[in-house]
Regions:
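C-terminal regulatory/oligomerization modules of transcriptional regulators
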Residues: 1-3, 103, 107-156
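N-terminal leader segment of winged-helix/HTH proteins
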Residues: 1-24, 70
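Short, contiguous, well-ordered secondary-structure segments
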Residues: 5-8, 72-79, 97-104
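N-terminal helix-turn-helix DNA-binding core of bacterial DNA-binding proteins
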Residues: 18-55, 59
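Basic, amphipathic "hinge/linker" alpha-helix immediately C-terminal to the N-terminal HTH DNA-binding motif
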Residues: 28, 80-102
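Extended, folded domain segments that form the structural surfaces/walls around functional sites
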Residues: 36, 44-51, 64, 94, ...
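Canonical helix-turn-helix DNA-binding module
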Residues: 50-76
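Residue-level recognition of short loop/turn positions
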Residues: 70, 94, 127-128
Length: 156
């Protein structure tokens, strides 16, 4: 990448307007980011977040509250027969838009941090069976898939 001419003197800075910095403020802890991952994987119930993330209930509670306050997640009431009403946690459209962010991080780190460049999971399009990945493209008609179109499998 290269800056356009007027930005090349390096006196200019994106500063507080940087969307990446704003996102990192929202995803400020490992637990918050893993809560997003688990939501993308379909986790919705508090106790399942605690178990799947592998951290304390207070840490998960703080993470879910932070995601809700930032507009990335909402609470949705549910009630099982004979039990008290409780809340599920679901990603908003803004939260679901983090799918390519998660996939880009996972894809890049699988390549460099995992033995043989392969992580424990692979992500495939349910319909075609093709692996799903993230690329930088200038094609406005490039194929896209949503989280609901992806099947997560163990890498073999």
């Amino acid at each position: 990448m290269e800056f356009e001419e007027r930005l090349r003197d390096r006196q200019w800075s994106v500063g507080n307007a940087c969307s990446v910095a704003k996102l990192l403020d929202l995803l400020s802890t490992k637990t918050v980011f893993l809560a997003v991952r688990e939501s993308l994987f379909g986790t919705t119930r508090f106790e399942d977040f605690v178990e799947r993330i592998g951290t304390s209930a207070p840490a998960v509670s703080r993470a879910l509250k932070q995601l809700e306050a930032s507009g990335l997640m909402v609470r949705v009431p549910y009630q099982e027969p004979g039990k008290r009403a409780r809340d599920e946690y679901r990603l908003t459209a803004a939260g679901e838009d983090l799918l390519p962010v998660y996939q880009a991080i996972r894809q890049g780190r699988d390549k460099y941090l995992q033995k043989g460049g392969r992580g424990p999971l692979c992500f495939v399009d349910r319909e075609s069976g093709n692996r799903v990945g993230v690329i930088v493209t200038d094609d406005p008609n490039a194929a896209t898939v949503s989280a609901g179109d992806i099947e997560i499998r163990l890498n073999r």
